[in-house]
Amino acid sequence: MASQGTKRSYEQMETDGERQNATEIRASVGKMIGGIGRFYIQMCTELKLNDYEGRLIQNSLTIERMVLSAFDERRNKYLEEHPSAGKDPKKTGGPIYKRVDGKWMRELVLYDKEEIRRIWRQANNGDDATAGLTHMMIWHSNLNDTTYQRTRALVRTGMDPRMCSLMQGSTLPRRSGAAGAAVKGVGTMVLELIRMIKRGINDRNFWRGENGRKTRIAYERMCNILKGKFQTAAQRAMMDQVRESRNPGNAEIEDLTFLARSALILRGSVAHKSCLPACVYGPAVASGYDFEKEGYSLVGIDPFKLLQTSQVYSLIRPNENPAHKSQLVWMACNSAAFEDLRVSSFIRGTKVIPRGKLSTRGVQIASNENMDTMVSSTLELRSRYWAIRTRSGGNTNQQRASAGQISIQPTFSVQRNLPFDKTTIMAAFTGNAEGRTSDMRAEIIKMMESARPEEVSFQGRGVFEFSDERAANPIVPSFDMSNEGSYFFGDNAEEYDN
């Protein structure tokens, strides 16, 4: 049952665990983090990186991608069966940056995947440690969510680009398991389902035969995951209909698009986890910190504390602003791409500005970029307060939905009202109300109409001082409601294209 996911904490999904108590969960998550750290130290030794180079976020991304590629079984199999010129299916690599005579140089490294797998397993007591791999995938996904706005992907499937706040996890690979499914936004799930249905419409054999049976199981599983994210009975009932359809087609696409729009006000519950780059875990392990013994949580104070004391560097292009680059990475580390900027600003203690106003491109450097003009700079990843990550979309008060917003998905459990422009959203609901789901549609629209933005619609704990590790004294910030706080919006962020 896909809905089982809701009964286990993210940490249990993260570590494929049975039901565990809090201490066991903290230990198993700590074990996972420690494994990533040990692997990173070993890779830095292999690549002969000095301490500074090892703390360079671009090197971290390359090393993370190498191990993810080494364990990508399906792609590895595909590459071996469909050899392409100049690509060795058994090797993996990427750009590694080193300081030579006061200048940054790019060096392309190539390793046997088998060798990378050996180093990874050795760092993880001989296990495949899938949880650690998923953790790195989620970090990459959070970085993509913060860097790119997925307008094109939305438009291609007939959805509105303003729905970008529903797109968390849209670049996560399929193989990211339960932990990955937990952090996917409603829009991401809808997009995956629509793509699947479209294939079925175009390819008569998609749902047929032995392969079709597997496809069908995958389809129903995805429907169940999405259903589990919705918090109102009517939205869930519509998902049941989409799932049970004998031959999914345009009617289902319509229903899914409708549901995605409804999630702008009747928010789904989407998990948030602070996944940090491997170059943060490595130095912590090297300094003698024992994550497994101390325990670790992805949704509490631990990642904040770790970032308070970490030194991470980044390459900076000539016309980029290092402070803006820092904000980008801070948001990615805290999984805050779709959080209200007012909440993020309060927690960070410095103003967090919209994507379109940031003078920075992505963190990764393309192979054709000129290295001569590159400098490096320290990323400022510290925060003024810490807050608990939430998984609630913040909408249902006793089945009566209150506010959402066209552009945020809460990350932090901080009480606020969610500003949203209801007229914009409701305008999207004129038109098609007939069809099998008309009564559910009517009910959903009614709930949306009764949503009042001025109510405090997100009951959260508040933020905490770093000295308050047990979260005993919440500080509830009061926000100025006049400036709405979405990060992407009327925006010119680059597009993510795989």
From Swiss-Prot:
Q: Name one GO cellular component term.
A: helical viral capsid
Q: Which InterPro entries match?
A: Flu_NP
Where can this protein be found?
Virion; Host nucleus
List where the motif Unconventional nuclear localization signal lies: 1-18
Which residue ranges have biased composition labelled Basic and acidic residues?
8-21
PTM comment, free text? Late in virus-infected cells, may be cleaved from a 56-kDa protein to a 53-kDa protein by a cellular caspase. This cleavage might be a marker for the onset of apoptosis in infected cells or have a specific function in virus host interaction.
* Keyword annotations: Capsid protein, Helical capsid protein, Host nucleus, Host-virus interaction, Ribonucleoprotein, RNA-binding, Viral nucleoprotein, Viral penetration into host nucleus, Virion, Virus entry into host cell
State the family named in the UniProt similarity comment for this chain.
Belongs to the influenza viruses nucleoprotein family.
Q: Subunit composition?
A: Homomultimerizes to form the nucleocapsid. May bind host exportin-1/XPO1. Binds to viral genomic RNA. Protein-RNA contacts are mediated by a combination of electrostatic interactions between positively charged residues and the phosphate backbone and planar interactions between aromatic side chains and bases.
Please give the name of this protein: Nucleoprotein
- The species this protein was found in: Influenza A virus (strain A/Ohio/4/1983 H1N1)
